[in-house]
Amino acid sequence: DWSWSRGLGDVYKRQIAGLPQAAVLILLHETSEDLNVIYCLRSNNLPTHAGEVAFPGGKREEKDETLKETALREAQEEVNLELKDVEVLGEISSVQSRFGLSVTPYIGILKSNTLIADGKEIAEVFSVPLNFIKNNMQKEQKSENWDNKKVFFPFFEFENKMVWGLTAYMTVEFLKLLDIEIDLTRK
């Protein structure tokens, strides 16, 4: 049962109307062993989020009629996604980034995993088995000061790559759709 209307945690319940918009694509690829979530390692040469793990995506441009188009366009640019290779299932609730963007995640099924990092914005494309995420999402969250509050974020590490912050939070929200609950209460 894909329920796209689940709410987000209190940290992210903010008015996001009027903010600049962005969209990301949470791509899933099924193998014989597991369902895998596709992540990107951003290039170290970028002015923001350098070397961080993210989903393919970015800011909405004037030419994008919808946020879904934004997510798909960015995935084409960053990881050479062929539109024929993805089926977009829908979106989950938008979240506000700490930089004042309203980010809308879209969920897509990747029919063939032939993604290639563009080498400019994205250094590497990698997939993480869903069961690994489920079993390794940390319960002691990393904290940061955000709007003068200490905020606790979910995170997990995979092959020396840290998935944290908004990317990990959107991952947890996606897992909720699959009725996989991650205990994020602070210990």
Task: Report the location of each language-model feature.
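Short Gly/Pro-enriched turn/cap motifs at secondary-structure boundaries
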Residues: 14-17, 97
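A structure-centric signal for secondary-structure junctions around beta-strands
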Residues: 8, 22, 34, 50, ...
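Buried hydrophobic packing segments
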Residues: 27, 167, 171-175
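Short aromatic/basic micro-patch
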Residues: 5, 54, 127, 165
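Unchanged
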Residues: 45, 59-159, 163, 173, ...
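N-terminal strand-loop-strand
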Residues: 16-55
